[in-house]
Amino acid sequence: MTQNRTHTCGELRLSDAGKAIKICGWLENLREVGSELAFAVVRDFYGTTQVVAETADMVALLKSINKESTISVEGTVRERDSKNAKLPTGEIEVVPGKIEVLGRCQHNELPFPINRSREADEATRLKYRYLDLRNPAVKNNIILRCQVVAALRQAMTEHGFLEITTPILTASSPEGARDYLVPARNHPGKFYALPQAPQQFKQLLMTSGFDRYFQIAPCFRDEDARADRSPGEFYQLDMEMAFASQDDVFAVLEDVLPPIFAKYGKYDRASSAPFMRIPYTEAMEKYGSDKPDLRIDLTVQDVTGLLGSCGFGPFEGNVVKAVVVSDFHETRKFIDKTLADVEVVSGGKPYWFRLDENGEIVGGIAKFVQPIKESVVSALGLKLSLIHISEPTRLRRIS
């Protein structure tokens, strides 16, 4: 394989029994059975291999090596007496003739167990990132990213797009966030900016006659961290098409994205083509957002006809919108906090009521709803343990 190893730690099989081999990796675990018998697990990028030391000298050598030290093992492959069907290498083990320490781990105790690194706090994981990345679960995320990017490149190329890398150091062109600035050494007092997106460059390409462009583009924005991205930078599939309509762009993405999500997605929830089209007005009226998360089955309903004339002052002369929440079993404290949060975000004061276990309207504005209970229950499909949150808004038109 290479001059330093003949096989990887995930490669050996029963058909290799009797072969003289050399593997390299990290000492993952050591189990001592006695002074002349010990089992070690050596791990590399590709998997793990069990090493069996059967002499006092070899056991003593393994005991002197701290876990996660880098070692090489030269020995002979043999069939295991006790096989592990859960491992690709579970039918074999290696009897070492020589073990060499290539890089010694200086500490007996690690900052966290490798296979549980995600349980450690973020600062510790980042400080010992080289250990965190040895966790198979973390490593597999990096591999998944590589596979998705490769699939995107292949799909875009098949659709006639050229991958063109655009400049990183550029002039400032504010696009909604703050720029990252880089001092220009030869021009004191002047700065380069890191691009928030390659917008101007891809437009330049189109005016230059290039027909279809894409890249896995780094974007830099000096903004606070979010739950789904690191502070400052992220990567996106950036694309541009000449002489194209909105539907032309949709058609490309409907071909490119569903197969990738179907192949690499954790859940089988990839949208099939054609993608659902939601007009802006409908999105705002039904979901209260121009980018609704359709996985959340909570829609806004216009109940002005039901509650606009129920006698409750704030509803009179206003549009009344409602959200029905099913399987609701929270405390009054939770309801009050939620409504307070909604008021801060929306600027309007929300009200609530629910159908209790006896089928009665209770809570909030219940006394105004009780006289029209049957109409409300029928129109909104209310069932026991459903909470109904209503909010008046001024009459307005969305165009």
Regions found by a protein language model. Name each.
Residues 1-390, 394:
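Class II aminoacyl-tRNA synthetase catalytic cores and aaRS-like
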Residues 395-399:
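N-terminal low-complexity segments that are often proline-rich with Ser/Thr-Pro
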